[in-house]
Amino acid sequence: MLKNMKFKTSAFNIAQLLETEKKQIVLVGKSNVGKSSFINSLANQKHLAKVGNTPGKTKSINYYDVNNEFYIVDLPGYGYSNMTKVEKLNTSKLINHYIEKNENISHILFLVDIRHKPTENDRIMYDWLTSKNIPFTIIATKADKIGTTKQKENMQVITKVLFAKENIIPFSSSNKLNLDIIEN
């Protein structure tokens, strides 16, 4: 667990993005993939990041300070159909600007749901991340929802659909599966 992790601020538009020299580890993934639960697991706090039952809860870029040394940054999920076209466009611009203009991103954690085949949006995100030359790791969330054999099968599907060259780490916020590996 990351000690002394606390919420710092939210950015709903480009003007609100945090200007900092601190390194940033960024979470990306589709809506309802478990980014907020992932943050809560890292911090060993149940309510640090607000977890929603409906997709699209996070509509801002949220910064979490870790030991006053670096930030975990939670980006809004993509693929949420209940956003208006204007909201989708504004969110897309915000995310693009954040990643394109930010020289302090040290790593990206790309979260996918292990229970489901990656979507076209996941594939687009994977290709986009690959083009950015920023180190990233694929985290397959919600691993506790399926058995070990199914986890292995589904990780192969994820690898095949994304054409992923990276290792995929199965993760569960419920039983903290592989939390120690991810923290390192």
Stretches with model-predicted labels:
Residues L2-Q16, D144-N184:
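Canonical P-loop GTPase G-domain recognition
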Residues L18, N62, M83-T84, T119-R123, ...:
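Short, well-ordered secondary-structure micro-motifs
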Residues M1-V86:
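Conserved G1/Walker A P-loop phosphate-binding module
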Residues K57, F70, G77-Y80, R115-K117, ...:
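Conserved nucleotide-binding/hydrolysis micro-motifs of P-loop NTPases
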Residues E21-K22, N40-A43, K85-K88, R123-D127, ...:
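Short, glycine/charged-enriched secondary-structure capping and boundary segments
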Residues K93-N167:
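Conserved C-terminal guanine-recognition region of P-loop GTPase G domains, centered on the G4
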Residues I25-V33, I39, N62, N68-E69, ...:
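Structured catalytic cores of enzymes that bind and process phosphorylated ligands/cofactors
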Residues K88-S92, T119, K176-L179:
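Amphipathic alpha-helical transducer elements in NTP-driven molecular machines
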